[in-house]
Amino acid sequence: MKVTKQTFATFTRKKVPLANTIHHSSFIYNQFKKFNLCKSYSNRVINHLMSILISIFISGYDGKNTDFAKNSSCHRTTIAHFLNSGKWDDPLLADTLKRSVIEIIYSEAARTGKPVFCIVDDTIASKTKPSSRALHPIEDAYFHQSHLKGKQDYGHQAVSVMLSCNGIVLNYAFVLYNKAISKIDIVQDIAKELPTPPVQSYFLCDCWYVSEKIINTFAVQGFHTIGALKTNRLLYPSGMKKKLSELAAELSVTHKNFDLVTVKGRNYYVYRYEGNLNGIENAIVLFSYPEKAFGKPKALRAFLCMDVSLSTNEILDNYVCRWPIEVFFRQCKDKLALDSYQIRSAQGIRRYWLIMSFAHYMCVVETGEVCPFETGYHKISDIIQMEKYLTLYQCARECNDFDSFVKVVA
């Protein structure tokens, strides 16, 4: 979208008071219209959502209520109340966003014949541990094991479910884990929401989500599971129970049982097992070593695939498509303030994450073409900045002197 004086003139014809145009974005307003939100939400709700979204695309943003207030005619406490306890239908935005993600990804699969990937993982939004005397500590924050940091990390744990096809990657759900329901059950519930994809499709996950319950639920929805596997899982070669790591040690005495395969320019020795696991029948398990670390126990990686028709290379190539969710987490922390927001209530946090997901969606698909998040983020930032320049220009033309101009735009 190119912002011009003509598009600005169209915007000003909407009877938005001149003093409020500095806190308005016609680009973001048009996104609300596409989602039919303007018919369901009051002007108050639309204005609060717009203030938060504008803030996200302004340089220096770190998720604080003061950031929102800078782009709103309301006090920061008013916006905090809107997130934490305001009465508005946030499930409407969540459901509308989910339907749009499904439509885009499934349409791409039907058009190209390429698989839909449902990708699941979790991350920690790190927070400072409050004093034991804190009167109002952040809700639903706990210590979680951070595999990235290799230690316990205090904060909110988010379970993300993304849908991907042919390079288009969109966030479908971003769920706050609060120990009232297991992460396995969270993912299982989301899986049940998904319509059957139009082509052969796959659920991609790390070893924490490879469970019989999840595998079976996704199978019913039309997704085969491809996931990492812990090396202590039990296999049944020739009907005998054996740990995966023990079997790998026996097989890796010689290279003859392994094939050398190349994935993304890197070489691996891979052994292909087909058979049963505990609670899982007739699956493929790949034992993998980097070419230069063959036979080393700490270098062993294992992968499960429930589609036995796939070749070894196809399994590994598909599993690599799980990586965008890691990139998504980094983008949320670097650009969307996932690690730095200051919101206390669980409801406010869930609502902020929903708005954050909407911002990510806009960056990927709403700038005139499907593009990487970073590209879309900078495009929208430029659009909003140009809109502000045009607003200031219009205000200056309407004011008789500098003092009246300051009163309007301050």
Q: Over which residues does each language-model region extend?
A:
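Active-site-proximal, Lys/Arg-enriched surface segment
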Residues: S85-N166, R266-E274
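Short N-terminal helix-initiation segments at or just after the protein's N-terminus
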Residues: S51-T66, R99-Y106, F143-K151, S245-L251, ...
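A residue-level signal for conserved active-site and pocket-lining positions in enzyme catalytic cores
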Residues: F68, V161, F358
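Generic structural signal for well-ordered alpha-helical scaffold segments
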Residues: I54, I102-Y106, M162, Q188-P195
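Long, contiguous hydrophobic alpha-helical segments, chiefly transmembrane helices and signal peptides
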Residues: I79-F82, I119, A158, W208, ...
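Gly/serine-rich nucleotide phosphate-binding loop at the start of the catalytic core
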Residues: M1-L93, L97-K98
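Single, function-defining residue in the core of a domain
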Residues: K2-N36, V45, L49, G113, ...
